[in-house]
């Protein structure tokens, strides 16, 4: 009996040892598998960044013993699909997002919180662009803002003030064919709120109070904003009627400029390639000083690196984002794409290249204001655009147009965001 009991104990001990060994083996295999999975990162980007990422990823892969897989596609489509991709487990680890999408996606739980590395050398404007309710959801990569393009064959130097633009408008060589008394000397797409905001802000208007975070305080009908709208109306009295058509005005402006009929226009850096292709002998400068002596305070824009909440390795993704926003990699981004780096040290490098467009954007960005990145901003665009059209067309005076726009924005926010 004793022998049988000892034998049973021995067998039990042996079985336990075998099970433990199997368990340890399974655990080891599982850990090995997890480690293997954690050593791969997927980055989703527009095709225009593919060469840049492939050129710079090797050092990161070597230093971190990781493989960076590059997938290309339309960035906005990728962001639109992020909710489903996060849920299904198919979200990439790193993406690029326009600043105006970062805050809302973060507040919706689609983006992971990030830490801005000291090496990213961000400034107050770019930091604000990736921050929502005190939380950082992206790391600034690229900056953009509106600038002044001018035709060097028509004017010898960039106009410095709006008073100079007004003088150009008196020159008969800029008379618009088909509409007596109308000029194309200077053109701006001011029925598009993105383009108009710099004028309004330069006079003291604003979208939301508390640096764009308080949707209960809308500053588009204050005294400064109304004065700006009244000034815009003086230009619409000079411009062809087609400038009032928000669906066709941008095309009209660019056609007049590329055909050599407009001396100066307000546009973004993304238009430079098409002007070059059209053979325009253009220059680029900061937007002229407003009649009140202040700067045109356009929206600051651009793109940030973000990490979806569905990332399988957020820690390594954060590390890759830090790598991409470091000074050396931001210099490489500029060299590869000519897009202006958010990193302030890399910006200095970009300026040293003596490129007119780069210098103008960086100088203008100093006066730029962060576009509010709270979700309520989506309720602003249509009413604010209507505000300028109604004032420009004479349907309403400036004060009424502004007051009505603020009411429309307030009502829509209440409807969409009421608790």
Range-by-range predicted roles:
Residues 2-15, 23-101, 291-293, 316, ...:
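Conserved N-terminal structural module of periplasmic/extracytoplasmic solute-binding proteins
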Residues 366-419:
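Conserved C-terminal helix/tail region of periplasmic/extracytoplasmic solute-binding proteins
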Residues 85, 92-93, 119-153, 184-188, ...:
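A structural signal for short loop-to-beta-strand junctions that line the ligand-binding cleft
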Residues 99-146, 157, 162-166, 177-180, ...:
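Hinge/lid segment of periplasmic solute-binding proteins
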Residues 156, 237, 276-338:
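Extracytoplasmic/periplasmic substrate-recognition and gating elements
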Residues 215-246:
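Glycine-centered hinge/linker elements that transmit conformational signals in sensory
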Residues 137-141, 146, 166-218, 262:
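Extracytoplasmic/periplasmic solute-binding protein
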């Amino acid at each position: 009996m004793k022998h049988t009991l000892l034998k049973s104990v021995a067998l039990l001990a042996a079985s336990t040892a075998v099970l433990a060994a199997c368990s340890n083996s399974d655990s080891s295999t599982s850990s090995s598998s997890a480690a293997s999975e954690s050593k791969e990162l997927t980055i989703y980007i527009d095709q225009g960044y593919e060469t840049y990422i492939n050129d710079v990823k090797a050092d990161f892969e070597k230093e971190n013993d990781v493989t960076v897989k590059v997938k290309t596609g339309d960035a906005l489509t990728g962001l639109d699909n992020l909710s489903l991709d996060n849920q299904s487990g198919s979200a990439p680890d790193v993406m690029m997002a326009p600043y105006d999408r970062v805050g809302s996606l973060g507040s919706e739980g689609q983006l992971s919180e990030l830490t801005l590395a000291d090496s990213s050398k961000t400034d107050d404007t770019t930091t604000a662009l990736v921050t929502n309710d005190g939380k950082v959801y992206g790391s600034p990569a690229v900056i953009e803002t509106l600038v002044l393009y001018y035709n060097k064959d028509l004017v010898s130097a960039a106009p410095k003030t709006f008073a100079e633009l007004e003088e150009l408008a008196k020159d008969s060589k800029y008379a618009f064919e088909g509409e007596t008394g109308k000029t194309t000397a200077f053109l701006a797409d001011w029925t598009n709120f993105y383009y108009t905001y710099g004028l309004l802000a330069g006079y003291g208007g604003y979208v939301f109070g508390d640096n764009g975070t308080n949707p209960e305080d809308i500053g588009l009908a204050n005294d400064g904003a109304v004065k700006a709208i009244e000034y815009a109306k003086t230009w619409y009295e000079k411009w062809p009627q087609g400038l009032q058509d928000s669906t066709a005005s941008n095309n009209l402006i660019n056609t007049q400029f590329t055909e050599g009929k407009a001396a100066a226009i307000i546009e973004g850096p993304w238009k430079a390639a098409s002007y070059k292709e059209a053979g325009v002998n253009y220059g680029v400068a900061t937007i002229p000083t407003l009649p009140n002596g202040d700067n045109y305070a356009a929206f600051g824009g651009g793109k940030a690196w973000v990490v979806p909440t569905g990332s399988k390795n957020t820690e390594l993704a954060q590390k890759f984002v830090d790598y991409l926003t470091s000074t050396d990699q931001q210099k490489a981004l500029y060299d590869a794409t000519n897009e202006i780096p958010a990193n302030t040290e890399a910006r200095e490098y970009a300026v040293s290249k003596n490129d007119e467009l780069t210098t103008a954007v960086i100088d203008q960005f100093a006066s730029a204001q962060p576009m509010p990145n709270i979700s309520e901003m989506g309720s602003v665009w249509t009413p604010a655009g209507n505000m300028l059209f109604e004032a420009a067309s004479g349907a309403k005076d400036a004060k009424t147009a502004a007051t009505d726009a603020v009411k429309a924005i307030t009502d829509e926010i209440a409807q969409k965001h009421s608790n």
